[in-house]
């Protein structure tokens, strides 16, 4: 992306939701998509495991992820996944009862965008009735469109017990 002020190339800040122009010093915070994702860059070398389009650098609630602009899936590092879910859950009252998952998703086979090996597809162990795919070797979780928010907005019996 080029700077809207001077036209020079912009640099993606590490651990930030912005791009910086080294020439004029401008910072650009891209608009959020209707999913709440800030798309920060052009496609990377890593391909979407679902639709084979190049994943882009993006940020969601301050956490850097890779995002597919076609199917809107998210590739999230396991080391930040739980903290991201907690951030999204904080401040929420109650929860939305999740719909039943599509069990046919358990039969799909996705390859990790990083190592290209088969990902493990399974039920998420927390709330939300979500099926996700992960790569233990690369410590990455793949969530289809809407599933992260489904996890965040689902009632959580363990959380409710802790608050009681």
What label would you give each PLM region?
Residues 3-6, 21-24, 48-51, 68, ...:
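Short cysteine-rich clusters marking metal-coordination/redox-active sites
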Residues 10, 20, 28, 74-76, ...:
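Short, structured motif recognition centered on aromatic/hydrophobic residues
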Residues 43-57, 62, 102-133:
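Intrinsic, low-complexity N-terminal interaction/targeting segments
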Residues 131, 136-137, 141-164:
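Structured core of small recognition/catalytic domains
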